[in-house]
Amino acid sequence: VMPVGRPFLEYVVSALADAGIGEVVIVVGPESGAALEHFTRAAPPVRTTIRFAVQDQPRGTADAVFAARDAVRNAPFLVLNADNYYPPAACRAAAEIGGNGLVAFEADALVRDAGMDTGRVLRFALVDIADDGTLRAIREKPAPDDPLAQRAERWVSMNLWSFTTDIFAACERVLPSARGELELQDAVTIAMRDLGQTFRVVRERSGVLDLSHRADVGVVKERLADVEPRP
């Protein structure tokens, strides 16, 4: 709930509400009472219903998604980072996928509309999109000479996903990565390779505000100055 005028999560949830999404599940750690306290006591939401799922240990993004399995009905659902502000139009595009899919953001738009420097953007994962608009692969931190990095249009994953409940079976199969974490990207790979799942990619030419670090507060606060969150 890092503040940028109002707690940042208010802006994130408000964008989802603007996109027509009324049910939100926030995954928290066992000691993370700040979000629970904020949304249940200090500032209850008016446009959404917020529930909480607990991830017992910070084992990675695939484990965080798996922790929410009991809170998700048997219908497609979105997964997104709580430290990113996605434009409502991008959230709406993700919701309209209606199955497995990913919203990919144009690298140049992240620089132009989100105030990120080019070097930072190119450290994000690049999306390899097949000719039919489906996901072929995601490349984490590609080398500068990688063909994806050399393309005129580069598409970046900012972790705005649409999933069916089949993703939970894939999350269960994930093994720790080189970083020792259970990565959501690996669950997606398993879903495609072993479970026969196809992921549609929606291209979005807009910025995503990233509040991963304290140093981001100034830029994010400036960009959200005219936004009044109404979660």
Model regions and ranges:
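Short aromatic/hydrophobic "clamp" motif used to bind/position activated sugar donors
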Residues: F77
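Active-site acidic Asp-centered loop
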Residues: L80-A82
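Conserved core of the sugar-phosphate nucleotidyltransferase
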Residues: P87-T165, A169
